[in-house]
Amino acid sequence: MNNPDLPYRQALECLSQKQYNFTEVRRLLTEAFSAGHPAAAFELAKHLMDADSPYQDREQGMEMLRIAAEQGHPYARYNLAYIQELEGAPPETLIPLYRPLAEEGLPEAQVRLMYLLYASRHFEEALEWAKTSAKNNNPHGQYLLAQYCRYGTPPDFETAHLLYRKSAAQGLPEAHWQLGLQYRFGQGTKVDTAQAVNHLRAAAQQGYIPAYTPLAELILPTAPDEAVHWFQQAAQENDPDAHAALADIYLQGKHLERNHKLALHHAEAAAAERHPEGLRILGDICRYGLGIAPDTEKARHYYRQAAEAGSLSAYQKLISDSALNHPDQYGGIKDSAIRRQRAERLYQKAQALHYGLQCAPEYAAALKLYTEAAELGHSKAQTNLGSMYYFGQGMTADYNEARKWFEKAAAKKDSMAFYNLACIHYSGHGVEPDKEKACRYLQEAINNGYGQKSVLQELLQQWQNAV
C-alpha cells in the first residue's frame, strides 16, 4: 500500500495556496484516510463542515468526522461529542465521551468535562479537573478553581482574586466580571471603583451580559451616555434591574429626555419580573397619572406588590397613603414597614459577613443574622440561609433544613430559591430524585426574574431531554 502521508502532505500543500482545486484536495485526502492516515479524514471534515466554505456538505462532513474518530483522531472524537452537546445531549451521555479525551490531555475536553461535572453537581471530580486545567494555565480552569476558592468552606477570597486575575489576563470575560464585582464590593481586595469599571467594561465589551447593568450603575454619574447604552443593552436581554433603571431615568428626565411612555414600558417590563423598584415606579406612574390617567387603586396595588417584594420606598408610599385615606390600616402597614426595615438591616449585615464584603467572612455570625432576618420573612435571607445549610457553611450540611428555607423563599417567588429547589430535586439531595419536579422549579426560576435566563433555558432543555 502507498505511504498515506504523501497524499496528505500534497493536500496540505494545495490548501496552502490562495486558490486551489478542492476536487483535487478531496481526492488526495480521501486517498490518505483510506490508507489509514489519522488526520486526513478530520482535515476533510473541517472543510466540508465550514459554514463559510463554498464546498460545505454537512452530511459528508459528519461522515468524515466519524471516520476520523474511528481512526482515533482526538479532535474528531471531541467534535462529535461537542456536536451532541450543542444538540442537547444530557451530561450523563456526554461525560463518558469527554472523560477519556480529558485523561489523554486534550485541553478542550478537560474544560467541557469540568463544566459538565460541575453542572451535574459532581463537585469533587470537577474540582480535580479544574486544578489540572489551571495547572496548565487554562483560563477556564483558573476561573472554576477561583469559584471553588470563593464559595468554599472556608472561603479563600484572596486566592480566588489572584486566580480571577490570571484568567482575566487571558481575556476570559466572566473572570473580568467577577473581578469587577470584587473590586466594587471589596471582596478579597480593597474597594476600587476605577478597577471595577475597567474589568466590568472589559467583560461587557466582549458581550458578557451579566456585566452590562453593574457597569452602567457605576458609570451613570460620570459617563451617563455610555451608562444608558449599557442599560439599554441589558434591557434588550430583559434584565429587570436595567428596565427599572431606565424607567426611573425616563421618568425623571435625567440623562435622557423625559418620556413617560418609555418609562411605563420599562416599569412594566421590570414589574413583570417582580422587581421591587419596577413595581414601585409603576405605582408612581399610576398614582400621579404620568402619561396615563391617574388610578389610585392601581397605584396601591403596585405599591403593595413592591412592598411585598422588598421595596422600603413602597412601604413609605403606603404609610403616607393610609395616613391620609385609610387610617384604620395605618398601624398595620407601619408595623410591617418597621419589620421589613429591620429584616433588611439584618440581611445586609449577614450578607457582608457571609461573602466577606469589606471584612473577613464570619459564617457563625452570618448564620445567626440570616436566621433572624429569615424569621421576619425576608425572602433573600431565607434563600441565603438555605444555601448555608446546603453547602455546610459554618455547620454540617443539612439538605432538609436547606430545602425548608428554600421552600419558604419560593413561596414568596424568589427566583434563586426556585433554582436551588430545582437542583435539589434533580440531584436527589435529601429527597428522591425527581427530574420532572426539578424542571418545574427551573421553569419557575425563569418565570420569576432569574438574572441569567438564557443559561437556565439551556439547562432546562438539557434536563427535559433527560426526563
Swiss-Prot record:
SUPFAM superfamilies: HCP-like (SSF81901). Sel1-like repeats lie at residues 38-73, 107-138, 139-172, 173-208, 240-275, 276-311, 343-378, 379-414, 415-450. Keywords: Repeat. It comes from the Bacteria. InterPro entries: Sel1-like, Sel1_AlgK, TPR-like_helical_dom_sf. Present in outer membrane vesicle formulations which are used as vaccines in human. This is Uncharacterized protein NMB1327. It comes from Neisseria meningitidis serogroup B (strain ATCC BAA-335 / MC58).
